[in-house]
Amino acid sequence: YNKEFLVSPRASVGFVPQSMPRLALRFATGLYYQTPFFKELRLPHTDAEGNEIITLNSSIKSQRSFQLILGADYTFRAFGRPFKLSGEAYYKALSNLIPYEIDNLKIVYAGQNLSKGFASGIDFKLFGQFVPGTDSWLSFSLMKTQEDIGGIKVPRPTDRRYSFALFFTDYFPKLPKLKFNLRGVLSDGLPMTAPHESRDKGYFRAPAYKRVDVGLAYGLVVPDASGVRRSGFLRHFKSVWLGVDVFNLLGISNVGSYYWVTDVNDIQYAVPNYLTGRQFNVRLSVEF
């Protein structure tokens, strides 16, 4: 639509030292483009009669990102189990950005390439097999993403500065058909604005997101370690698991968005819309 000609060169390299075969290093770089889609082409403006109209911006350009990524993986054994520690650091120089704001559940785009910015951070993740064939993991991330709108530096709508997550699964002693899993998340709140306002006019952050889920699953049909094939109707199934979960175990009220109320003095107040509280779930998983 905008008649752009794009070239996206990319390169990556990996290295495993002979003296440390359990360590793998990698580096990647490249120039990436994101072509605009319909909602980003919409350019609102006011005509001579004061009516707001929408036109399509044919001169808009693709958003561009130059990326540098450095990572490493290290495998080892502990407690008689295999583990892998992964780490990654990245920097992304962003240009020709199309700013957008989130109004409750609606995303409103500026319709023009008005800003530039960056995203940088580090990620760490530890994998481990406490249960053979099933990964448990622990992750931690730090990130900063910022853009310049009209000479004012503001966080991007996805600026979640920290995040911690875990997933752990294990069997009960002497009950190999009964499996327990635990999931937890703690992450920073996202930037928020009042309706019809942009972040360069002011913003605030939602509270941190916190959630813990637990689950139990019982194997009604599990693979036979001896390799003996089942007979009858059960021979059609590889495994059947019946499980029960408690989502948001601690009943934490996490904020999803805000509903704005205006009083007679034209002052706006942010009323939080909360996500689902504690919830129970029953599931049946069948593998053929």
Annotate each predicted stretch with a short phrase.
Residues 90-93, 110-194:
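Gram-negative outer-membrane beta-barrel transporters
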Residues 5-7, 64-68, 116-120, 158-164, ...:
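Residues that define the transmembrane beta-barrel architecture of outer-membrane proteins
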Residues 1, 29-35, 42-45, 74-76, ...:
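Transmembrane beta-strands of outer-membrane beta-barrel pores
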Residues 11-15, 70-74, 122-128, 138, ...:
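Residues on the lipid-exposed face of transmembrane beta-strands in outer-membrane beta-barrel proteins
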Residues 16-18, 26, 30, 40, ...:
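Membrane-embedded beta-barrel scaffold of Gram-negative outer-membrane proteins
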Residues 1-24, 46:
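Signature of Gram-negative outer-membrane beta-barrel scaffolds
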Residues 18-23, 77-83, 133, 173-178, ...:
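Short loop/turn motifs that connect adjacent beta-strands in outer-membrane beta-barrel proteins
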Residues 133-136, 185-195, 218-288:
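C-terminal beta-signal and adjacent terminal beta-strands/loops
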